[in-house]
Regions:
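Acidic, Ser/Thr-rich low-complexity segments on the non-lumenal side of membrane proteins
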Residues: 131-135
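Amphipathic, cytosolic membrane-interfacial segments at TM-TM junctions
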Residues: 25-43
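Membrane-helix interface segments in multi-pass membrane proteins
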Residues: 48-94
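Hydrophobic, aromatic-rich membrane-embedded alpha-helical segments
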Residues: 1-25, 97, 118-128
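Membrane-cytosol interface at the C-terminal ends of transmembrane alpha helices
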Residues: 14-31, 91-112
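Alpha-helical transmembrane segments in eukaryotic/viral proteins
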Residues: 4-7, 22, 57-64, 98-101, ...
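Cytosolic juxtamembrane helix at the C-terminal end of the final transmembrane segment
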Residues: 101-130
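Hydrophobic alpha-helical transmembrane segments of multipass integral membrane proteins
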Residues: 7-10, 14, 42-53, 87-104
């Protein structure tokens, strides 16, 4: 189940790790890996949301400035920032896929592998010591 928590986040985003975390709550190993995958998805959604906010802000500012200057042509920010938003999303998703595969393999080997930063947070939430022992 720990492997599934990592691998299913590629297609199931935050839903699959959440379901596994809730169902396998009694297993420290599975809940630790599922919580890490869930925290990664939360971070992923925050980064995507931040990219959308910046893109929307850039488009609005360009439209306001072009309207104020009397220029009625299409705002260039839309055509510049839309591909940037797409590249932002794809690069973050690609990194998430690599992380999911690497840590899914480690979970399959029975390792208590931690995501950078998020692993420590998951350990604190579950009150675990390094290696999975309860505090």
């Amino acid at each position: 189940m720990a492997i599934l928590a990592h691998m299913l986040q590629i297609v199931g985003l935050w839903i699959a790790p959440l379901i596994i975390f809730v169902i396998k709550r009694e297993s420290r190993f599975v809940s630790f890996h599922a919580l890490q995958a869930l925290l990664l998805q939360v971070l992923y959604l925050l980064l995507i949301g931040l990219g959308v906010v910046f893109w929307f802000g850039a488009v609005v500012l360009t439209m306001v400035s072009s309207h104020a200057s009397g220029n009625s042509s299409s705002p260039p920010a839309f055509f510049i920032f839309m591909p940037m938003l797409w590249l932002d999303w794809m690069s973050i998703w690609g990194a998430m896929v690599v992380i999911a595969i690497v840590y899914g393999v480690k979970a399959g080997r029975g390792e208590w592998a931690e995501y950078p930063f998020l692993g420590r947070l998951a350990r604190r939430i579950l009150k675990l010591r390094p290696g999975g022992a309860p505090e």
